[in-house]
């Protein structure tokens, strides 16, 4: 992902406009990778019916750390994570949160095992800037055709 963004930087500056922005983007990609590790373990365990208290707790903590950091980065009311335009950090964030929303499809399984959903109904109140940014990205013209139907499908499972 990083290499592709660097190759096209003259046309699409997804890796920032200077070394400072590139460094910030790298930081977001690194924390996204840490979150992705625990979220993938969690989502795979959910799909296999093997989620346990340890896996659930690690994913819950990973999400809280990730979302808290993003919430702080988006303060005060930034429209993007780095710089003044969409960057690789925003793309990665949108992809990670959309993938994590697959938890919605396993709400019944979580309930049967006595676990609450990590992306519970009030999570948007806990991280308002994160979810406002995600909503902006879903409606971004280059994301909308693919991301919006995917997220809507997952949200419909949460409502069910």
Predicted region positions:
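GST-like domain detector, emphasizing the conserved glutathione-binding G-site
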Residues: 1-64, 76, 81
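Preference for well-ordered, secondary-structure-rich cores of eukaryotic proteins
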Residues: 10, 15, 38, 48, ...
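GST superfamily/GST-like fold recognition
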Residues: 25, 81-116, 123, 137
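Short alpha-helix boundary/capping elements
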Residues: 33-36, 96-101, 159
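Alpha-helical packing segments of well-folded alpha/beta enzyme cores
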Residues: 59-70, 96, 130-134
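Surface-exposed helix-capping loop/turn segments at secondary-structure junctions
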Residues: 72-84, 140-148
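N-terminal DNA-binding recognition helix of tyrosine site-specific recombinases/integrases
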Residues: 133-141
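C-terminal/domain-terminus segments
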Residues: 144-160
